[in-house]
Swiss-Prot record:
GO terms for biological process, alphabetical: aggrephagy; autophagosome assembly; cerebellar neuron development; cerebellar Purkinje cell differentiation; mitophagy; piecemeal microautophagy of the nucleus; protein processing; protein transport
Record's protein name: Cysteine protease atg4da
Catalytic residues identified in the record: 131 (nucleophile), 368, 370
Top EC class, one word: hydrolase
A cellular component annotation (GO) from this entry: cytoplasm
Protein localization: Cytoplasm
UniProt xrefs under Pfam families: Peptidase_C54
The keyword Transport belongs to this UniProt entry's keyword annotation: yes
Organism: Danio rerio (Zebrafish)
Gene: atg4da
Amino acid sequence: MNSVSPSAVQYIVGGGAHEDKASASSKRHLGHGAVPDGIREGSGEPDEVDRLKAKFMSAWNNVKYGWTVKSKTSFNKSSPLILLGQSFLFNNEDEVERFRQTFVSCVWLTYRREFPQLDGSSLTTDCGWGCMLRSGQMMLAQGLLLHLMPTDWRWSDCHALTDVDFEVLKPRSPSRPAGMSMPSFSSSWSSSIPQINPSPGITEAHRRAPARCPSASPDPQVDALHRKVVSCFGDHPSAPFGVHQLVELGKESGKRAGDWYGPSVVAHMLRKAVARAAEFEDLAVYVAQDCTVYKEDVMSLCESSGVGWKSVVILVPVRLGGESLNPSYIECVKNILKLKCCIGIIGGKPKHSLFFVGFQDEQLLYLDPHYCQPVVDVTQANFSLESFHCNSPRKMNFSRMDPSCTIGLYARSKTDFESLCTAVSEALSSSKEKYPIFTFVEGRGQIYGMEGPSGGSVDAPAHIFTCSRLSRNNKRGSTDEFVLL
């Protein structure tokens, strides 16, 4: 009998045996996004019944999403795979290893349980409702890695894996090309990463240091930066980008713990969170208005303080079709993911958020937040990083992507921003549709005085969406509306 691969172990939970006992009624009431009112409402300590409900939800969720790793993820060895602006061709072991280093180094943020109680509720888990928050966290985390870490940084202390299966599959039909199955990776590093070019804050000694073999001990200063990024998303009230802080910011948009958060609302919550984080005064987040990036607004935002030009994360909420994805925009999405300035796309299937980081052929590569893990105390000096990195790459067809999504971009300097505008505009011009996904224009956008998803006094201009082109019969909430393309 085949052994269980480590990639599958990431999704297995001891409560999996409850799957057979879950009735149809249980599945209906514990479906994605459903939170028992007794848990969500109230500010007192959760009673034993609430704890049991939360544990059952966690166990059922892990069983449900554990099914996705039963089948191996196949990769076409003759087609390039794009991952956050980098291209990989799996025709040799070095390329497979390079992909492994890059993918596993992405920060993976998932459901957590047993964290401090969320304000205004008795919830101690985001299982079943916080997947879009986690996807947004992952996109911001990727931006922080680019902002803080050395260029081409790779996590040197990867999971200790033993199962290796690089089986080369024969074509089953003319429509299925030969591929490479990659359920897990070896724990031994077989190649060195390129010479790294540190970001500001890295000393000259680090700048001149030779390229480090991934199997060597991590650089203490770089490791500290890595932990700083992860700890910003800790599940406790003082973490600047943690669930507790995001839920608090969501109240300004009429949201509360246990509600469904759409990609546009999450974009504005991330903008506010970064604006209020004193430790990131050199970083700003701009949210596009009406599918338009106003260059003068971005310039004003990045030059608004005495610290010089701020690096900027640009978030563009869009809707790529009506009830389903418009196939005409697939090529544009691919072209955006090819750009090194792209930090991913948050979206996914309806009520099922995923963080898209790349693609191969007609399939998207993603990180899945739907695995519920125990909380990690990131305030400890040497907290474990293993649960914040995923070693199981997953794919899905573009056709299954929900049209509501938010695109993330990052520019370190003014020059980078100008290059970003040019590169993204060229990528968007590939669309066969009359209207591009979004545009860059000179000048400023309209400043709205009303309180909405972008409201709050901590940052201006306040960008919210006007949906004049949306049908009045659209069933989506007003705080999660998009301009239809």
